[in-house]
């Protein structure tokens, strides 16, 4: 959740309030009844809701809920000004707080300043996607080919590969990277 407050309750007894910068990770598994209600009195409610398809063998697992406050999400700050919030997976040896996920995802919130470059290894067998929600950049897969210019509100999907490269021009870019 980038801005606002959201209350979660579900039939398994889980409850929590998600605040700006926090993450809620829920596994529906064999099924769960839940509600999410905005709690802010005024202002912006801005965030993302993503669904991960479980492997067939895990679709009937018990429901699970994890509320991660913003302060529990580590931020990798590189010397070149790149900031990476690590929700799940690992970057520069820093693990994200969301663990024990059967799909083993990489889930990052990446901010790259103007005139910078970013490279991220993507595990073989994983498809990667980048949703750009601020700014613009050139996204490529490290194959020597020219990248593709992608701007805010656009989604890029990358096939199985080892490397994602992002270059910024006069404006920076912020995006979710999920693999």
Per-segment meaning from a language model:
Residues 37-44, 54-104:
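A short, N-terminal "cap"/entry segment at the start of jelly-roll beta-barrel domains
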Residues 46-48, 82, 106-108, 116-118, ...:
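Structural beta-strand/beta-sheet cores of well-ordered domains, especially the beta-sheet scaffolds
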Residues 2-10, 28-30, 90-96, 106-123:
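Conserved short histidine dyad/triad with adjacent acidic residue
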Residues 4-14, 20, 27-40, 66-71:
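Short acidic (Asp/Glu) patches
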Residues 1-6, 51-56, 107-113, 125-139:
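Short, conserved beta-strand element in jelly-roll/cupin
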Residues 13, 29-58, 149-152, 159-179:
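Ligand-binding loop in jelly-roll beta-barrel domains
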Residues 16, 22-24, 34, 44-48, ...:
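Generic beta-strand structural signal
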Residues 9-27, 122-124, 128-131, 136-169:
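Short acidic-glycine-tyrosine-enriched beta hairpin
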């Amino acid at each position: 959740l980038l801005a606002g407050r959201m209350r979660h309750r579900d039939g398994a007894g889980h409850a929590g309030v998600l605040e700006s910068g926090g993450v809620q990770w829920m596994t529906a598994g064999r099924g769960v009844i839940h509600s999410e209600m905005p709690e802010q009195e005024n202002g912006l409610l801005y965030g993302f809701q993503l669904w991960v398809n479980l492997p067939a063998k895990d679709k009937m697992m018990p429901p699970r809920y994890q509320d991660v406050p913003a302060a529990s999400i580590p931020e990798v700050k590189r010397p070149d000004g790149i900031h990476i919030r690590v929700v799940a997976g690992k970057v520069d040896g820093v693990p994200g707080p969301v663990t024990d996920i059967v799909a083993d995802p990489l889930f990052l919130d990446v901010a790259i300043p103007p005139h910078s470059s970013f490279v991220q290894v993507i595990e073989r067998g994983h498809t990667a996607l980048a949703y750009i929600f601020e700014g613009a950049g050139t996204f490529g897969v490290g194959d020597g080919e020219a990248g593709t210019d992608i701007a805010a509100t656009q989604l890029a999907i990358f096939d199985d590969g080892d490397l994602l490269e992002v270059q910024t021009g006069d404006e920076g870019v912020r995006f979710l990277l999920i693999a």
